[in-house]
Amino acid sequence: VLSGSDKTNVKGVFGKIGGHAEEYGAETLERMFATYPQTKTYFPHFDLQHGSAQVKAHGKKVAAALVEAANHIDDIAGALSKLSDLHAQKLRVDPVNFKLLGQCFLVVVAIHHPSVLTPEVHASLDKFLCAVGNVLTAKYR
């Protein structure tokens, strides 16, 4: 459960990310594919090279979902309901991949905004990303 300070911290991070969300989304995916090559299996039709238009486009979707969740932090489940249905019923993505993506997003934020990612903010952002992952996997059951 996200506390009031967690919510403030998450909104602060997304405020700092600002117009870079799409770029960070693509960078997160590239990092995930490089670090966890097994995640590539869900994208057999993608050009997974650095700077690929397909990775950028999907990164934009990832970023949009995270921004949507942050903007509706009191109702993440409602904000991501359709995306949860898609991943559970059609795409059938292994739930562990959401954790891997979250870890990679934390690294990207740390690279670009090291001073923002204090231990408290890091913990809040991690809790938020876990909450997003839980919402996206809730309909698997």
From Swiss-Prot:
GO terms for biological process: hydrogen peroxide catabolic process. Heme b binds at H87. Pfam families: Globin (PF00042). O2 binds at H58. It comes from the Eukaryota. GO terms for cellular component: blood microparticle; haptoglobin-hemoglobin complex; hemoglobin complex. Red blood cells. One of its GO terms (molecular function) is oxygen binding. Heterotetramer of two alpha chains and two beta chains. Involved in oxygen transport from the lung to the various peripheral tissues. Belongs to the globin family. This is Hemoglobin subunit alpha-A. The gene is HBAA.
